[in-house]
């Protein structure tokens, strides 16, 4: 059966995509459609253009170029024929479709009072396919357990973009919420998890309901600014663990401090390739100073899967039981 | 003598029966024609009402177009319902046609059940190009234009109804009578 996201494409692009070899098709990450320019796909960290015969090429001149008509059709299909229901999404620059896949949009902005009010003449589409990999957090989770408090440690996950941060914290949320701690001595039940999903990436919510399995005891605040969302969650939903993606601004840090005092555990992600990077960013260096996080994990994507290294709150390397870096592999779930 | 009388009476009866049938047929034809004149403004009115509901669904309900069309169709009655639900059907899975194609297809296939004319068809055809493809303000503008056009068509249709509805009814009966007189 073809995956659900394929139905948003116009017929000819759909047939080009479904004619791809299964190894490429299975590893698709992004499909980029630009009006009048080559159709590009990204799979497994590499990119190529598609020819109109369905072949793959790196020569832009030979590539298939989607026309204005096809782009309009794509827009019509991803908005469910109702662009007028997507005004908020257009302001943010992306639309989430069924299955939690996100489609980034580029076009001409219409300003109102200096702020983006609307996006029109949309000519660039970036279909980012969301992957749900259950079990991706199996190796990280036992390292961030807090046995004394029967909880998890405050953890900051660092990695450059496109390395699987979001996929990892989605699985963390699921496992913490369902209480599968992956450790023989961890025998406490699942905890209440609150996800602040500013860009609808973690849970892929559609109409407020998560598309992905984020666990039975998980609440999702969808499309909410992180700092505000964290406060709202703490006040209204009494979470045990808060999960936020891509913190970095100073108000995020304030909200994190608030969460700490409220006794809520926090797992957050940020862009960066090592812990020392953080000290050069004003807001994040404050985090380091008050040693808010008890554990730092730096991700790296390898050919086999995902590897991570750990640092503790004093920024000492934590040696993992078997070797410096362990591969985290999971079973991919087809959305 | 009695036999001849009876035969004559029988012939007369047949003639009268024939005359009645001719007049009835002509009157029916006239009536059907006049009913078309009565149905057209009525259907235009209902189309206008449907568009106004669509306006509300878009402006205040943020309802996606296929759902809105289905819901409005249920309230509009045939033959408008057929066109709207047909359009929604083409938009939804598994067809996944664009809003423009869906509405045009629906109008094409459902128009024969309506009493409306080409002018109204053109209005819906024009609307299909913009429906669902812009923000709310823009959508409202386009729908309002369509409604205005339909209203002017409705006026014309009402005038025609006043002028022709009765005329066709009496014309039918008169035609029948004329044919009967000719044959006598």
Where do the model's predicted regions map?
Chain B
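Juxtamembrane/interface alpha-helical elements of multi-pass membrane proteins
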Residues: 15-92
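Bilayer-spanning, highly hydrophobic alpha-helical transmembrane segments
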Residues: 19-29, 157-184
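A generic short alpha-helical patch detector that favors 3-5-residue windows
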Residues: 42, 46, 115-119, 142
